[in-house]
């Protein structure tokens, strides 16, 4: 885990990273799993990087926003600092859908006063050398780039 390695270098044995991500996860799926995760780990910081799979499935942006808001609320209720990492989706569903999808992250971050990394795949998306054959998901070469993008947000939350 690159994040754990970076944290261990700067803060030896002070922070434990729990990667609770699930491949193909939607905001609804995460919402069902989050209460138990919060209870089990009692995290100081929760990074929410979800919604992309909802968007690829054409889920209503309002539903995605509602789920993101609930994920933030549940985390904040447990006294965790929340970071929201935004996503963008391919233009398959049209400009209006894409804009509504992307605005979800801004709205939720402003409403709940959480830090927003606007686009977690900035510098990765669209770069064929950093994306898997599905043209959506980042490959192993992209991971250090994504860590460098996310780390200032994570470090600031500690």
What are these regions (language model features)?
Residues 1-23, 33-42:
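Serine-esterase "nucleophile elbow" of acetyl-processing enzymes
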Residues 28-40, 62, 66-70:
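Alpha-helical scaffolding within the catalytic cores
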Residues 39-42, 78, 157:
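Glycine-rich phosphate-binding loop signature in dinucleotide/nucleotide-binding domains
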Residues 16-21, 45-49, 82-86, 117-118:
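Structural recognition of the beta-strand scaffold that forms the well-ordered cores
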Residues 88-158:
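Catalytic His-Asp segment of secreted/periplasmic serine-dependent ester chemistry enzymes
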Residues 22-28, 52-57, 63, 88-92, ...:
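Solvent-exposed loop/turn segments at secondary-structure junctions
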Residues 49, 69-103:
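Active-site segments of SGNH/GDSL-like serine hydrolases
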């Amino acid at each position: 885990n690159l994040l754990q390695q970076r944290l261990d270098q700067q803060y030896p044995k002070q922070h434990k990273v729990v990667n609770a991500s699930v491949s193909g996860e939607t905001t609804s799926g995460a919402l069902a799993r989050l209460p138990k995760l919060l209870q089990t780990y009692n995290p100081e910081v929760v990074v929410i990087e979800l919604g992309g799979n909802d968007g690829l499935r054409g889920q209503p942006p309002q539903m995605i926003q509602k789920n993101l808001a609930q994920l933030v609320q549940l985390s904040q209720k447990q006294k965790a600092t929340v970071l929201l990492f935004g996503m963008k989706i391919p233009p398959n569903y049209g400009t209006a859908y894409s804009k509504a999808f992307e605005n979800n992250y801004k709205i939720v971050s402003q409403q709940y006063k959480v830090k927003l990394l606007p686009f977690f795949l900035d510098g990765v998306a669209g770069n064929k050398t950093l994306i898997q054959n599905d043209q959506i998901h980042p490959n192993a070469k992209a991971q250090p780039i994504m860590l460098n993008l996310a780390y200032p947000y994570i470090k600031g939350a500690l």
